[in-house]
UniProtKB/Swiss-Prot annotation:
Family, similarity comment: Belongs to the RNA polymerase alpha chain family.
Matches recorded under SMART domains: RPOLD
Span list, region Alpha N-terminal domain (alpha-NTD): 1-226
InterPro entries the record matches: DNA-dir_RNA_pol_insert, DNA-dir_RNA_pol_RpoA/D/Rpb3, DNA-dir_RpoA, RBP11-like, RNAP_asu_C, RNApol_insert_sf
Catalytic activity: RNA(n) + a ribonucleoside 5'-triphosphate = RNA(n+1) + diphosphate
Lineage, uppermost ranks: Bacteria, Bacillati, Actinomycetota, Actinomycetes, Propionibacteriales
Protein's name according to its UniProt entry: DNA-directed RNA polymerase subunit alpha
Gene Ontology CC annotations of this record: cytoplasm; DNA-directed RNA polymerase complex
Organism listed in the record: Nocardioides sp. (strain ATCC BAA-499 / JS614)
Annotated function: DNA-dependent RNA polymerase catalyzes the transcription of DNA into RNA using the four ribonucleoside triphosphates as substrates.
């Protein structure tokens, strides 16, 4: 069995909708394999939502003009292509826009139904004159990739309903590069850097996660041919290894006071793993193990990034440890007596 070191994935946030992801170390050659697969999946296969058709009052086709509206219908449709929406519905849903009087018509004037959100309300759609009026229906559907207006035109399309081009992908741009990185004495490992920029409807980290899920599902088809086929196994992450080591640590290595250690030992709690499986009440039920002993244990566990089973967040270990003074037995006196 060949075991490769588990790569780490870190995120560097450039702005709210752009992040840079670093995956390293990868076996030689896998940087380009993974980078190209992720890029193509991110650009083509991340689910999203888009407007698929519109209907404007008193307008029959896209080559019309609208009384009191500066832009013609074609310009309005072009502006709507910049609309960023998300939908929780699998079926098509309808949004409504109604505006009258002089001024700009923006995406903020759209009234979406429950489960649909407009993410760029400042988008300008049209300009109205004093007597201008614009009433419109917008159909939103979920999908992926790009679908042309011709494809969106249904066989039973009603008169006045105009199909539009739909850009479902919430990912705007993806670039990647592969650099060399070092692991111990070897310098030929790959370091993959992926730069992802998205629309406001999705975060870059969620887009990466979606692409990873899609690729795992697809590559799983090949694995089903022989689930026992030999390949490169990925080793445990450093975090998992450290956690396993911490849980196996003997309680005596926590350097507790003699009273606390003896109480735990008498209860049969010998490792940190056994300790964190207990609640505060479980420990308080131990004879001569009081509230101060609880605080001492919690402080030691917090230093390791661990906690008791039901410990509330916000515990201050420094304040608790300051109350103990020196490490000798007299510095830690319980209210209970032997």
């Amino acid at each position: 069995m060949l075991i490769a070191q588990r790569p780490t994935l870190s995120e560097e946030t450039v702005d709210e909708f752009r992040s840079r992801f670093v995956i390293e170390p990868l076996e030689p050659g896998f940087g380009y394999t993974l980078g190209n697969s992720l890029r193509r999946t991110l650009l083509s296969s991340i689910p999203g939502a888009s407007v698929t058709s519109i209907k404007i009052d008193n307008v029959l086709h896209e080559f019309s003009t609208i009384e009191g509206v500066k832009e013609d219908v074609t310009e309005v449709i072009l502006n709507l292509k910049g609309l960023v929406v998300s939908s929780e519905h699998d079926e098509p849903v309808t949004m409504y826009l109604r505006k009258s009087g002089a001024g700009d018509v923006t995406a903020a004037d759209i009234a979406p139904p429950a489960g649909v959100e407009v993410h760029n309300p400042d988008l300008k759609i049209a300009t109205l004159s004093d007597k201008g009026k614009l009433e419109m229906e917008l159909v939103v559907e979920r999908g992926r990739g790009y679908v042309s207006a011709v494809q969106n035109k249904g066989a039973d399309n009603e008169i006045g309903r105009m199909p539009v081009d739909s850009i479902y992908s919430p990912v705007l741009k993806v670039t990647y590069k592969v650099e060399a990185t070092r692991v111990e004495q070897r310098t030929d490992f790959d370091k993959l850097v992926i730069d992802v920029e998205t629309k406001p409807s999705i975060r870059p980290r969620d887009a990466i996660a979606s692409a990873g899920k899609t690729l795992v599902e697809l590559f799983g088809l090949a694995r089903e041919l022989n689930v026992e086929a030999e390949g490169i196994d990925i080793g445990p992450s450093p975090v998992d290894e450290q956690l396993a080591a911490d849980l196996a640590l003997p309680v005596e290595d926590l350097q507790l006071t003699v009273r606390s250690y003896n109480c735990l030992k008498r209860e049969g709690i010998h490792t940190v793993g056994e300790l964190i499986s207990r609640s505060e009440q479980d420990l308080l039920d131990i004879r001569n193990f009081g509230a101060k002993s609880i605080d001492e244990v919690k402080a030691k566990l917090v230093e390791m990034g661990l906690s008791l089973k039901d410990s509330a967040p916000g515990f201050d270990p420094h304040a608790a440890l300051a109350a103990y003074g020196d490490d000798d037995d007299d510095a830690f006196v319980e209210d209970e007596q032997y």
